[in-house]
Amino acid sequence: MNRILFAGLSSGSGKTAVTCACLRALQKKGISAASFKCGPDYIDPMFHQRVLGIPGENLDLFFADAKTLQRQIACYEQRCKIAVLEGVMGYYDGLGGVSDRDSTWDVACATNTPVILVVRPKGASLTIAAQVRGMLSFRKRNQLAGILLNGCSESMARLLAPMLEEQTGLPVVGFLPYVEDASFESRHLGLVTAQEVGALSEKVDRLADAFLQHVDLEQVLRIAATADSVAETVKSEAALKSPDCPDSPQFPAPDKQCLRIGIAQDTAFCFYYEENKRALRQQGLELVEFSPMEDKKLPEGICGLYLGGGYPELHAGKLSENSGMRHAIFEAVRHGMPTIAECGGFLYLQKELEDPDGQIWEMTGVLDGRGFRTNRLQRFGYAVMTAKENSMLFEKGESIPVHEFHYWDCTQNGTAFEMKKPVGNRTWEGSVAGNSLYAGFPHLYFLAEPRLAERFARAAAKWQEKQREKAL
């Protein structure tokens, strides 16, 4: 499958804007594309999803191995002509900021994807060539295949392009100028969600028009066509009829009746890995969306709950005022309905939650803690989570890679797991786990351990059977 990866010298290079512009430009040209985000960020794929109209996915080597990433890409070969990957942070920045492991470069090598380096030439010219040459020589295998100038005027691009090509040997595929009123706003969790960006479609259209005018799309496609083929063994393992890959070994096709799972989906709860949703569907689970902010009761006939991350702290007042939903969730969890609550969902299960103005609001009360605001990220980044006891999703001693990204903390974070940073010796306890509940700040990634989805489905089936027995 043809593919291209947009990477940067650092965060703030404009990778997201360039990636979205490219995706929409491809769409305008009638070229079907799949989108992927390097690393654990679940916000950028939401932008990709809005642009493409199909789900975006993550490619993360801390969560999964190279073969799994290749399989993810292979799943889209029948439907799409090209995969567009967006990098994370600086190109070589990996674990702990001191390693290239799990970096954008690592993903590029693992997936054999050519890379276009997005460079913002602000206050520099020849120095950019020195930086790029350093990038080229830093690792023997670098995957770098081109340069795109971002936030650059046409006159500056005409000056820089020939110099950069001469000094680096890489082609400059074009430039993306500053497009007025087409920037993405900021929020404490990186970027605002796709649902909240004002006139996102119009913004991306303007970026795409600029991309088509100033970037040589044909050259980008030629570079993408140099990508090495995904191994035939990987292709054969992936079900290429659908991006859901139902026959993939990662998601064994279950022979089960469909069970309904309520999944919180609104502006307060919207952070989910598409791969997690797919894993649950592969286990015979129908994901039924509901809004903890707007709906007064849970969906009918559900056998489990999935409360994802998001911004409940920004909507604490409205969540609190919806007492019908708060009570419904309290009763469901109290009576043993299988429940997964991650980050924002974990805060919603607490007794109280502080909003950005310092006001305290009543939440569901499933747990006895209070969520409160801090002035910096808490336990940010990757960790390895090891179960201290058996529970719905885990057996004692099992470990799984996870990720945390949150400014809010909690008075009671749980003690069911031993947490450890992959770099350094920092450890702590976290998350709550029981026979029918997982709740904690860490985001789970089901590709890292497919048995999590299997066990959740098994718990949902047992719950349904129990309810049927009660009804007899």
Task: Map each language-model feature to its residues.
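Cysteine-nucleophile active-site neighborhood
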Residues: 312-391
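Residues that mark the start of a beta-strand
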Residues: 3, 31-34, 258-260, 286, ...
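Phosphate-binding active sites in nucleotide-utilizing proteins
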Residues: 249, 259-323, 327-332
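C-terminal and late-domain segments of enzyme folds
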Residues: 108, 269-281, 286-288, 373, ...
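ATP-dependent carboxylate-amine ligase catalytic core
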Residues: 2-17, 23-111, 119-146, 151-159
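Internal gly/pro-rich beta-alpha loop/helix module
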Residues: 125-243
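Beta-strand->loop->alpha-helix junctions that form or flank phosphate-binding loops
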Residues: 37, 172-180, 286-294
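Acyltransferase
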Residues: 195-240, 244-255, 265-269, 430, ...
